[in-house]
Amino acid sequence: MTFSLGQLALLGVGYLLSLFLAAYAVERNWLPRRWVRHPLIYVLSLGVYASAWAFYGSVGLANQYGYGFLAYYMGISGAFVMSPILLRPILQITRTYQLSSLADLLAFRYRTPWAGVTVSIIMLAVVVPMLTLQITAIGDTLHLLNNEWPVESLALAYCVIMIIFAILFGARHVSPREKHEGLVFAIAFESVLKLVAILVLGAVVMFSVFPQVGGLEQWLTTNQEQLAQQQVRLQDGPWRTLLLMFFAAAVAMPHMFHMAFTENTNPGALRQASWGFPLFLLIMSLSVPPILWAGYYLDVDTDPSYFALGIGLALESVPLTLLVFVGGLAAASGIIIVTTLSTAAMFLNHMVLPVYKPAPRYDFYRWLLWMRRSLIAVILLLAYGFYRIVGSDLDLSQLGILGFVACSQFLPGILGLLYWPQSNRRGFLAGLILGTLTWVYSLLLPFCELALGWEIPFYLPATDEGNWHLSAIVATGINFLLFVIISLSSRQTAAEAAAADACSIDTVSRPSRQPLVALNSNEIITALSAPLGRYVAEREVLQALEDLELPSYEDRPSALRRLRARLEANLSGLMGPTVSHDLVNRYLPFREGAELSEDIYQIEQRLEGYHTRLGGLASELDNLRRYHRQTLECLPMGVCSLAPDGEVLMWNQAMAELTGTAAADVTGSHMSRLPAPWGPMLLDFLQSQDMHRHKHRIDTGGRPHWFGLHKAVLQPSGGQPGGLVVLLEDQTETQVLEDELMHSERLASIGRLAAGVAHEIGNPITGIDCLAQSIRYETDNPELLEMADQIQEQTKRVSRIVQSLMNFSHAGHHSTEHDIVDVTYCINEAIQLLKLSKRSQDILFENDCPPELYTKGDAQRLVQVFVNLLGNARDASEPGDTIWVQGEREEQQIRIKVIDNGHGIDADTLDHIFEPFFTTKEVGKGTGLGLSLVYSIIEEHYGHISIDSPVASGRGTCVTVSLPQSEHTEVTETHS
């Protein structure tokens, strides 16, 4: 039974097109997102591991090693069962630092470009045999179904088709940041297809083939001797070596790394994969023994690796044969697409970009895209070249062994990355290189010699399919041994130690608190424009800011450090960790000479993420840290901790409530970024020699507040450079109570004085006034009448003085419930009252205050204030002078200035001008209580009054009144 090449080509291309349409439907959002991102899709996408070697070659493994073929499934299943301590930490590292391949991961950990180059070159030794295996399998199956064309030509045609589809599937995006969800869905689809194909074949064997001889059990009983001769006992074969190889494949094989880590969009899906993927492999392995036994029974004349296809041909079942062919095509195509994509990205990052980058004027993203496409074609053509030279003469098992043994050479470096922070680049590179050379000498060259019949004059060991595992053990053992010995005998660099902390699952990385040369995000864009071009630099910086949920402009030192780290991670996904690390270090350097210390805030943030994973003493210490942190957070007094350079490291809840600035907005920034009045107040205190300040007044929230400030110096210890702790205590209530107490005492004293004056003077004055009135009624003598008028005038004067004393004594006893007051209206009222006096007729009053000056207070008492101030200005002015009243709004206050051009006030007088009974007017023209009363009223309104004199040319006075500003625009009717 044969098929035409056209039929096979139509079937194969049709299948690949269906895969592409599935991927395209996902990218166009034709399918619900909950389907695409379901953990089951992720689990099935890991089925890319089941390549043509699993679909076809596992039957050959069963023929060689008996039940040892299960190592193919059990080795990698063991790695996924151990995912909490093996795969999950790697996933976290790759997601955090945007590492898209094993070369990226190892170059990041061992901090040398040679690590990336070496891993990339050796990965080629892994990839080429694995791709050759797929090409061989598809070429051989095509030849079995149609023997009219040479198998080499069929293999070449398959390679060309796969180059096209690999580019269509994965080389349409620039950065691995853009997940290929369509590719993941397509690989999940092909996993289902090959699982269905092999299960259907197994069912046909069980229920259609063996019933002819009484069932499978009867046939096995009859052919025990034949089966025993063709199988190897587990203890005699390479069982343990196979387990180790396939265990390492979970991380080291490029297609598994890509699907498990790079394309992972939901870290939680790895939990389902830890049991779901082993279950998938177990189900797939169930059909392998029946297929092998059916091949024996039907006497299929193909290699045991192709028994699956041979059974369909032997049964002359066209549907079964085509289903198996499509299943094998799915197995081979999936791994080819994913492997070439991941390997091309690896070579681009570590072999091309370190050597050549396009000029900034070119479209960097487009150049990356075409370079990746070219590398995909080169890798597949290299695999085809190896197939033409050697691969066609090696069976599937030999090709698979070559690839997986080479892959296991990465295992020491991976384990050191996770569990041995002291390992270093020298040990890693020495072990990897010598282990790989041992693989070449003891495995690759002997297999090539056997396949081609060459005589290679290098005294090669006699390696064959029976003892290859010894060479594999020697190569891996030498790798491990050198890795350990050289790492122990040499020291790490500082960069390696930092990377080791970032990668180790037993430690929390300790980021440093070091300022950048760039002062803001715009300067970072400018710095990166030199190597990347303006467009790419701006796009990458804005993307990093968006990832960190930061504003488009950022200048906080802590945020800039986070931005730098995020940029390095994002650029790592674009061009690899080596190039991105060098680029960031060169164009975004830290400031030289700055004192290096650990970033306590970032360390605490990371410890919070590790809290549930800590145990034992570490957990107890973390609980103690959290308790102390909570104590500081809940203190009723504001507490902030500062680094020596003024960067805020801690800002507790009370501090946030007092200042109105949240901890997230100020932590990591300099104190100078705090808004007024807090920034200037705290900076002035920090720069002073004072360790304590009591009752420091600031105006905020429309009223004055008083604060106590205290600071303490933190001495350097434990690698930390020290710093300052500042305590902020709200003393407003205490100050208000003290003011009220003093005010009450003063009023009581004045009240007693006024009462005494009224008692001692009031009654006699009343009597004198009565006597003067009696004189007016009892005489017509003009002289006596004039004398009586003078007596009454003087008694009225004394009465006014007594009334002033009484008014002063009652200052402060007015209601504290204030209304919204239009200050401009009060000034106009005061001016109108003054104009009623004859002394104001030749004085011009100019009110230049804006119409919306509002405060909370007593309108009548504020009118009294301005009557006093304007009256004093009038008394100091000459006829024809002008008195100006100016007003302005500030952040929290309104400011009113009363300016005259009078004779001014000398300095000695200014020092006593607000004291009671102090006056510069002539005797009989003032009591000295006016400005004292003004001062009391302004204090009642939480305001402030000051006098500057002279203003200019030795003349003039400016009285400034500051009152809390109110935002209300409706004014009460108290003005009337």
Report residues per predicted region.
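Detector for a conserved hydrophobic position within an alpha-helical segment of the HATPase_c
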Residues: 938-939
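Conserved catalytic submotifs in the C-terminal HATPase_c
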Residues: 839-854
